[in-house]
Amino acid sequence: MTDSAKDLAVRSQVTAEEWEVRINLAACYRLIAMYGWDDLIFTHDAARVPGPDDHFLINAYGLMFEEMTASTLVKVDLDGQIVLDSPYPINPAGFTIHSAVHAARPDAGCVLH
């Protein structure tokens, strides 16, 4: 499947609001890489998915920041369950930090560290 086909596949499964968050978070990852602020694959950023569920997007483990796209971001719940099929795993350490912040601060739309 080509990258554009993957984008269409994911885009067709999410709301317009979630797609916008995915685009913005992927851009954030790429900016971090461009400025050299990443730590290879061991840094994490996450964004809350708009809506009533406690879901957020986090980077796919194993991809470099400059490889991140809206479609490669992984959607998880606060228990670490992947809620939208993804071929990518997540980093448990990154999940632990971000889920704790998102659980404690429902007003936080994005967490960067």
Q: What does each model-found stretch correspond to?
A:
Residues R22-L112:
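An anion-binding catalytic pocket shared by soluble metabolic enzymes
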